[in-house]
Amino acid sequence: MYWQKIPKTSEKNYISGYEALNIPNENGDIADWHPRTYLSSQNPNEYIKTYKLDETIGNVGIKNKTINFPYKAEVYIANFVRAIIDIIIFSERDIEIKSLYGCRNDFLTDKEEKELFEELIEILKKGHKKSDKIVMFLENEYPRK
């Protein structure tokens, strides 16, 4: 097994999703606990997956910072809230969203959990093309709000 290589990133092509959830944030915390699943490969030349910027959402939650895992590098990477939002809006199948159920309690601090809800509501107000996926997630994660 090899750790995947760090790709070239930019504000419009950045690390996000489960990959970002498995890279320690500035506090050294990780949200998900499966780095081998999302950051390793049998192929020594494989790169970490990147995401293309969704223009409706913009660059909220994407920062240029130095990461120390799997290698030290300066990259554009989503914070945990944005990583979850990207999983929702880039999902091709409902199972990908269902795999996030419980994430606000498992992955996020109270502050991040509130930020996730507020960001998703803002995206809905903009009429995002994946609004149905966002509603599906919100109905499960925030049933009383």
Regions found by a protein language model. Give the residues of each.
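Short gly/ser-rich loop at a beta-strand->alpha-helix junction or flexible surface loop bordering the NTP-binding
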Residues: 1-66
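Hydrophobic alpha-helical interaction segments
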Residues: 63-145
